Curated annotation (Swiss-Prot):
Belongs to the fatty acid desaturase type 1 family. A motif (Histidine box-2) lies at residues 216-220. InterPro entries: Cyt_B5-like_heme/steroid-bd, Cyt_B5-like_heme/steroid_sf, FA_desaturase_dom, Fatty_acid_desaturase. Residues 17-94 form the Cytochrome b5 heme-binding domain. The histidine box domains may contain the active site and/or be involved in metal ion binding. This is Acyl-CoA (8-3)-desaturase. It comes from Papio anubis. Widely expressed. Expressed in brain, liver and thymus (at protein level). Isoform 1 seems to be more abundant than isoform 2. Expression of isoform 2 is very low in spleen and not detectable in skeletal muscle. The keyword Lipid biosynthesis applies. A motif (Histidine box-3) lies at residues 382-386.
Length: 444
């Protein structure tokens, strides 16, 4: 359907509401004009994307689409946010238009919204501050124990190794806590979440909060959607991911890597390398290129603290060795945990599906246990986390049975597996997609 030359000009809001069809909204998904729909209201976000507090890309990923459910999922004070959005309002959907596109399951969406209302009434969106305080204290204890190990027992091999393990655990657990704060799930106000987020991710880890939010919010908005989820940006230059994209790549006769061997070289360029050889340097480029000076200042305090506490005990050379070992161990831990929920799942281009279908087809869980909860920072409840990204993690297990019932009713697969099986499935999926690429490359 060709765009109407009259309608192509963005109308000015007047006293009488302007009405639009889904076709008109869908046409505004490019670089010049971007519209989206929330609760049947049509908003022109073309200029606003650059000022969006959550980042320009995450909101742009919903241009031309209904964004009601992600809007609810990502914003705490929705009434206040909508007041600020009034200046972007240009009209609403015509009365004869459905509330969302035909690619979305109406019954599933309606029932999920009822489930969300139930979850809020049950108080499952409210944080237990004692839980998070104890969690922070356990991180500080691990961090302090690492230094005390060297101070008390000296710098021989075994104390050095124990220090590295304790410091790695502290770094990983700080990573899980900053994840909670980045999702605004610890405090009732955004201000306090942001402030403590800077402390945990910046001072305790040496990572910029703005970089994490920029990347992670996109992942949650469109998980496993190529071109929109930065977590799968390693396709196609390093890995061929997913059945559909791998076959597509093979048919195009593109070969950046020997993908049929990717399940082998994953062990070399995946878990061991991501943090020490990429994240470690890229975060500095990010904050300097985007002039995020507050983030840079927090990061510098992390390195000053480490230098002042460890160099007097170890000397500079041994300290640098310790730092690299910690980042190496952290990288392995981080990559296996963060990839086990998504890489084995469906990966495709954005098909503009409803919120529940988008999250469930791209996400799986790992069975609950005290160790799995701690080891993964409760990311073993990835399905619940993706459906309710602002829910405090200590409530995931409470909402899980309700989510399972919703999935069973609508014939949606709810995957949960043992931890080691989840790790193995990463390798199995890489092997399968690599073979699919090879078959398409050679024979299609």
């Amino acid at each position: 359907m060709a765009p109407d030359p009259v309608a192509a000009k963005t109308p000015v809001q007047g006293p009488t509401p302007r009405y639009f069809t889904w076709d008109e909204v869908a046409q505004r998904s490019g670089c010049e004009e971007r519209w989206l729909v929330i609760d049947r209201k049509v908003y022109d976000i073309s200029e606003f994307t650059r000022r969006h507090p959550g980042g320009s890309r995450v909101i742009s990923h919903y241009a031309g689409q209904d964004a009601t459910d992600p809007f609810v999922a990502f914003h705490s004070n929705k009434g206040l946010v909508k007041k600020y959005m009034n200046s972007l309002l240009i009209g609403e959907l015509s009365p004869e238009q459905p509330s969302f596109e035909p690619t979305k399951n109406k019954e599933l969406t309606d029932e999920f919204r009822e489930l969300r209302a139930t979850v809020e009434q049950m108080g499952l969106m409210k944080a237990n501050h004692v839980f998070f305080l104890l969690y922070l204290l356990h991180i500080l204890l691990l961090d302090g124990a690492a230094w005390l190990t060297l101070w008390i027992f000296g710098t021989s091999f075994l104390p050095f190794l124990l220090c590295a393990v304790l410091l790695t655990a502290a770094q990983i657990q700080a990573g899980w806590l900053q994840h909670d704060l980045g999702h605004l799930s610890v405090f009732s106000t955004s201000k306090w979440n942001h402030l403590v987020h800077h402390f945990v991710i910046g001072h305790l880890k040496g990572v910029p909060a703005s970089w994490w939010n920029h990347m992670h919010f996109q992942h949650h908005a469109k998980p496993n959607c190529f071109g929109k989820d930065p977590d799968i940006n390693m396709h196609p230059f390093f890995f061929a991911l997913g059945k559909i994209l791998s076959v597509e790549l093979g048919k195009q006769k593109k070969k950046y890597m020997p993908y049929n061997h990717q399940h082998k070289y994953f062990f070399l360029i995946g878990p061991p390398a991501l943090v020490p050889f990429f994240f470690q340097w890229y975060v500095f480029y990010f904050v300097i290129q985007r002039k995020k000076w507050v983030d840079l200042a927090w990061m510098i305090t992390f390195y000053i603290r480490l230098l002042l506490t460890y160099v007097p005990l170890l000397g500079l050379k041994a300290f640098l060795g310790l730092y690299f070992i910690v980042r190496f161990l952290e990288s392995n831990w981080f990559v296996w945990v963060t990839q086990m929920n998504h890489i084995p799942m469906h990966i495709d281009h954005d098909r503009n599906m409803d919120w529940v279908s988008t999250q469930l087809q791209a996400t799986c869980n790992v069975h609950k246990s005290a160790f799995n909860d701690w080891f993964s920072g409760h990311l073993n409840f990835q399905i619940e986390h993706h459906l309710f990204p602002m829910m405090p993690r200590h409530n995931y297990h409470k909402v899980a049975p309700l989510v399972q019932s919703l999935c069973a009713k609508h014939g949606i697969e709810y995957q949960s597996k043992p931890l080691l099986s989840a790790f193995a499935d990463i390798i199995h999926s890489l092997k399968e997609s690599g073979q699919l690429w090879l078959d398409a490359y050679l024979h299609q």
